[in-house]
C-alpha cells in the first residue's frame, strides 16, 4: 500500500479511537474504517511494522485483542504535511490539515529559498490563483508578469530602465514610415520541444490584429528565411516597443488545439509551466532557452487567499523568522482611480462628477481608512505620482441625487476597502452607494451598467509608451470616455501627443479621478541577489539568484 494512503488510514484509526489504547476486535476496527476484516488485519500488521502501533491478537470466540498506539495521529499528520510541502502538493495539504490558520503557518515557514537535489527553488506566497496566462486576453498585473517569464516576443523592454532590447529578433530596421523589418534568431525552441518557425511568429501577430493598438498592421510576410517584414497603414514610432508587449508574445501556431493552454501555456521563455491549479503555480527553468538560462531552477507560487486581507499581502517570499530579511519597496507608477461612465445619466452629469470627486477626495479616503492602510496609501492627484493634475474644488450636492452604482472586479481586497469607505462617506450625505463585484473579464469589457467604476492601473517602463498603450487597450475606458480614441492613437504613434496634457484633460473633465498611489512591497531574504522590484510589484525570476552560505 502506498505510504500516503497508509498514513491516512492510521490517522483515521487514531481519530476514531480518540488516540486511546484499548481492547477491541478486528470486526469493530474494520467497521470503523469501512473495510473487510482481512484488509483490517493487513493494515494493522503493516502499521505495526512501521512502528506506529502494536496489535496483540487474541484467538478465540469472545476474546478481545489489545491495540496500543505508539505514535499519535497528530505527529503522523504533521509528518505527512511536511512531506506534502516538500512535494509542493498544496491542494492535498489543505485537504489533510483543514485548518486554514495552520496551513498558513506551515506555508510561511517554508517560504523563500529551498535547495533540493542540487536545485535552487524559490517559494512565494500569493493571495489568488493565476489561472489565465494567455497573451492578448484580459490579464491582471501579476498575470502580465508571469506571462513575461513564460513567453518571448520579437523585442523585450528592460524592466529596470525601460530600454528596448533584442529578444527573438536580434536586429530590426525601419525601411520606410510604413515598413519595418525584423531579423529573427534561428534555433529557438518551444517548451514542448518543437523549434520555432516563421509561421508561429506570423500567426501570433496576426492573431492580435483586432486589438486597437495592433489594428494598423496591414500585412506580415517573410521575404527570406528568418526575416520578417511588417507593413502598416499608418506610421508608428512605437512599433518595436509594441512588439515587446505581452499581447505580441509568440505562441505555437497550434495553441488552440493544446489542452488548457490559457492555464498551462507553452512559450519559448526562460520558464515553463509545470503545474497550475487553484492552490499553486509551479514554473521551471527551461534548459533550452535561447538566452541566459535562469539561475533559480524552480519557482513555486503558493496560493493562500487569506493573506488578501492584509494591506501588504500581495507578494510574500520571506522565510523563517530567524532569517535576515531584505525589504524592497517603491511607490507604484499608477494609481487607483474612479472612472465615470458617460453612458449613464448620472455618470455623464458634470455636477455629479464634480460633487462626487469632491466628497471622495484622496485625502478624505486616506483620512477614513484604518491605520494599516494609511501607511501604504498616498493621495493621488494625477495618474502618475509626479503629476499634480487634480484640483480640489468645493461643490454642492446635485438636487435629487439619492443613489449611485459603483462597480469593480473581484478578488481584490483593497477594492472592497476603498468601496466601503466611499459607501460610508456618501451615506453621511444621504446617498446610497450600490456596489457590484464582477469578474475581471466582465470589468475589462465594460458591458455592465454602472455610474462609476473603481479601477487600478500599474504602468510599466517606459512610461511615455505604456501609459497610453495601457489605457487604449482597455475596452471599458473606450466605452466610458467619449473621445476619438483612433485619432488620439494616430497622434501617439506619430509622437505628436503631449501625454501629460492628454491625461490632465481626462482628469480636469472628471472622466478619470485619481485616488490613491500604493506602496508596493516585497519582503525577501538577505541571501537573495538580483531582486529588483519592477513596476508591477514583482521581480524578474531569471535574474535573481541565491548567494551560498559563508564557508565555516
Curated annotation (Swiss-Prot):
DNA-binding region: 26-49
Alphabetical keyword list: Activator, DNA-binding, Repressor, Transcription, Transcription regulation
Residues of the HTH marR-type domain: 1-116
GO biological process terms, semicolon-separated: negative regulation of DNA-templated transcription; peptide transport; positive regulation of DNA-templated transcription
Domain of life the protein comes from: Bacteria
Region (Solute-binding): 163-492
Gene Ontology MF, one: DNA binding
Pfam families reported in the protein's UniProt record: SBP_bac_5, SgrR_N
Role this protein plays: Activates the small RNA gene sgrS under glucose-phosphate stress conditions as well as yfdZ. Represses its own transcription under both stress and non-stress conditions. Might act as a sensor of the intracellular accumulation of phosphoglucose by binding these molecules in its C-terminal solute-binding domain.
NCBIfam families: PRK13626.1 (NF010149)
Name under which the protein is recorded: HTH-type transcriptional regulator SgrR
Taxonomic source organism: Escherichia coli O157:H7
Gene responsible for this protein: sgrR
Amino acid at each position: 500500500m502506498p505510504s500516503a494512503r497508509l498514513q491516512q488510514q492510521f490517522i483515521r484509526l487514531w481519530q476514531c479511537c480518540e488516540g486511546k489504547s484499548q481492547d477491541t476486535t478486528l470486526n469493530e476496527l474494520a467497521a470503523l474504517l469501512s473495510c473487510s476484516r482481512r484488509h483490517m488485519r493487513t493494515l494493522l500488521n503493516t502499521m505495526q511494522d512501521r512502528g506506529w502501533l502494536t496489535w496483540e491478537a487474541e484467538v478465540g470466540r469472545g476474546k478481545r485483542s489489545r491495540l496500543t498506539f505508539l505514535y499519535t495521529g497528530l505527529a503522523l499528520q504533521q509528518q505527512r504535511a511536511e512531506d506534502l510541502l516538500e512535494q509542493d502538493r498544496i491542494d492535498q495539504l489543505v485537504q489533510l490539515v483543514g485548518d486554514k490558520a495552520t496551513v498558513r503557518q506551515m506555508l510561511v515557514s517554508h517560504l523563500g529559498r529551498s535547495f533540493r537535489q542540487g536545485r535552487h527553488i524559490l517559494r512565494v506566497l500569493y493571495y489568488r490563483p493565476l489561472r489565465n496566462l494567455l497573451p492578448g486576453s484580459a490579464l491582471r498585473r501579476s498575470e502580465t508578469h508571469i506571462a513575461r517569464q513564460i513567453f518571448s516576443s520579437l523585442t523585450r523592454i528592460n524592466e529596470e530602465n525601460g530600454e528596448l532590447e533584442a529578444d527573438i529578433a536580434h536586429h530590426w530596421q525601419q525601411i520606410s514610415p510604413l515598413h519595418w523589418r525584423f531579423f529573427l534568431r534561428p534555433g529557438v525552441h518551444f517548451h514542448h520541444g518543437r523549434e520555432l518557425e516563421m509561421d508561429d511568429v506570423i500567426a501570433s501577430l496576426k492573431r492580435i490584429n483586432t486589438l486597437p493598438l495592433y489594428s494598423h498592421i496591414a500585412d506580415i510576410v517573410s521575404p527570406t528565411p528568418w526575416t520578417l517584414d511588417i507593413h502598416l497603414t499608418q506610421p508608428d514610432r512605437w512599433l518595436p516597443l509594441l512588439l515587446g508587449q505581452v499581447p505580441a508574445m509568440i505562441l505555437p501556431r497550434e495553441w488552440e488545439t493544446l489542452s488548457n493552454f490559457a492555464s498551462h501555456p507553452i512559450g519559448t521563455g526562460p520558464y515553463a509551466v509545470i503545474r497550475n491549479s487553484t492552490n499553486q503555480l509551479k514554473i521551471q527553468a527551461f534548459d533550452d532557452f535561447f538566452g541566459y538560462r535562469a539561475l533559480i531552477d524552480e519557482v513555486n507560487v503558493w496560493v493562500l487567499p487569506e493573506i488578501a486581507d492584509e494591506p501588504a499581502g500581495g507578494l510574500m517570499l520571506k522565510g523563517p523568522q530567524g532569517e535576515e530579511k531584505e525589504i524592497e519597496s517603491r511607490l507604484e507608477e499608477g494609481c487607483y482611480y474612479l472612472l465615470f461612465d458617460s453612458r449613464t445619466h448620472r455618470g455623464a452629469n458634470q455636477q455629479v462628477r464634480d460633487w462626487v470627486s469632491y466628497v471622495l477626495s484622496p485625502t478624505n479616503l486616506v483620512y477614513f481608512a484604518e491605520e494599516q492602510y494609511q501607511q501604504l496609501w498616498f493621495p493621488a492627484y494625477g495618474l502618475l505620482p509626479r503629476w499634480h493634475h487634480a484640483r480640489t474644488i468645493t461643490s454642492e450636492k446635485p438636487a435629487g441625487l439619492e443613489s449611485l452604482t459603483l462597480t469593480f472586479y473581484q478578488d481584490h481586497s483593497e477594492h472592497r476597502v476603498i468601496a466601503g469607505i466611499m459607501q460610508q462617506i456618501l451615506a453621511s450625505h444621504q446617498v446610497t452607494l450600490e456596489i457590484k463585484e464582477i469578474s475581471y473579464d466582465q470589468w475589462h469589457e465594460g458591458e455592465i451598467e454602472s455610474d462609476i467604476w473603481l479601477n487600478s492601473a500599474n504602468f510599466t517602463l517606459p512610461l511615455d509608451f505604456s501609459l497610453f498603450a495601457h489605457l487604449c487597450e482597455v475596452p471599458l475606458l473606450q466605452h466610458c470616455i467619449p473621445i476619438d480614441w483612433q485619432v488620439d492613437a494616430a497622434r501617439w504613434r506619430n509622437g505628436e501627443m503631449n501625454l501629460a496634457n492628454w491625461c490632465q484633460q481626462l482628469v480636469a473633465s472628471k472622466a478619470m479621478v485619481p485616488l490613491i498611489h500604493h506602496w508596493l512591497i516585497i519582503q525577501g531574504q538577505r541571501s537573495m541577489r538580483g531582486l529588483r522590484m519592477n513596476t508591477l510589484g514583482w521581480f524578474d525570476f531569471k535574474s535573481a539568484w541565491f548567494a551560498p552560505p559563508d564557508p565555516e
